Amino acid sequence: MSILQAAESMPGDLAVRLADADAEVRRIAVMELPYSDEDNILPLLLKALADADPQVRAEAAKAVEGFEEPEAVTALLGLLHDTMEETRRAAADTLSELKSSSNSGLLLQAVDDADPFVKAAVFRALRPLRVADSLAPALSGLDHPSPQVRREATGVLGYLKHAGSLGPLTRVAMNDPDPEVRRIAVGALGFATDVEVLPALTHALNDSSWQVREEAAGTLGKLKLSGAVDYLVTAMADRYWQVRVRAARSLGRLKAAVSLGVLSEALTHEISNLRKEAVIALGEIGDPRAIPALETALEDPDPDVRKLTQLALKQIQLNNPPR
């Protein structure tokens, strides 16, 4: 008996309602399935995934999350071509929650689909699985005409952290016409281990999109590239405070004493998040020359800033014991 045939013979009120002529009754029954006492609800879910009503199929696509069986994955891949957008998106969302790499084979079979939505959804599902066989399709996806496909392909490469993708990711970070693709590529360069990516990241600090600049400022700090200090100091004057926050955080990680001036200036910024990051960075740098500015911050109107300032001052004192 097949898994779908098993659904036909399964007793219980839910099974009866899933066969009701009223689509709304079936839809509500699907919503209840994950919370039912049925020992094996997968056959019922698979039947609902093939329901004649698109709303029922959409609910089934949501309800099947957590099932890793090939039958469920195959059915969800089929729903990526559904006539209703809600159903397609529900299927894509559930596929993105797959945890077992054993499903990568089914996903890779669909990665060359001509539909950009399907292709992007498959890349999105492959990303957390980190399977080596997704490298080649993802590299190819960087040149796809659809920005959504390029975004998801770039995300796959970021998760794989393969040295062979550094060059292509650098090119994308600097040249892709879509700002979100550039932002994802900049973040993906965070797995690099040398200064090869420094030109691309410093270039990104001048990107027209502030989200790309923000990502670049953060990535430079993660890599702890000393050659980035001057660029990060300049980024502390960015017109978007979100970029300054990341730059301040990175300057602290780099323990860049040359940034004491710009970090001290940030202690008076109207955005408290930036003041907090500047205080933390000054504490990490540990230079006694920051003490006067930090003592002023002890009167900050934000209690979190005041608390962090006390910690930063203690940190500086510990790093500079009296002789």
Describe each model-derived feature in a short phrase:
Residues M1-G66, K307, K314:
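N-terminal alpha-helical scaffold/docking segments in eukaryotic complex subunits
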Residues A6-R17, E38-A50, E69-H81, S100-D112, ...:
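Amphipathic alpha-helical scaffolding segments comprising HEAT/armadillo-like alpha-solenoid repeats
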Residues A21-D22, A52-D53, T83-M84, A114-D115, ...:
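Short inter-helical turns and helix N-cap capping residues of alpha-solenoid HEAT/ARM repeat scaffolds
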Residues E32, A63-G66, T94-E97, A125-P128, ...:
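Core register positions within helices of long alpha-helical scaffolds
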Residues F67, E86, L98, D115-P116, ...:
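Core solenoid repeat modules with strong leucine/isoleucine-rich periodicity
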Residues A237-L311:
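Ankyrin-repeat and related helical/solenoid repeat scaffolds used for protein-protein interactions
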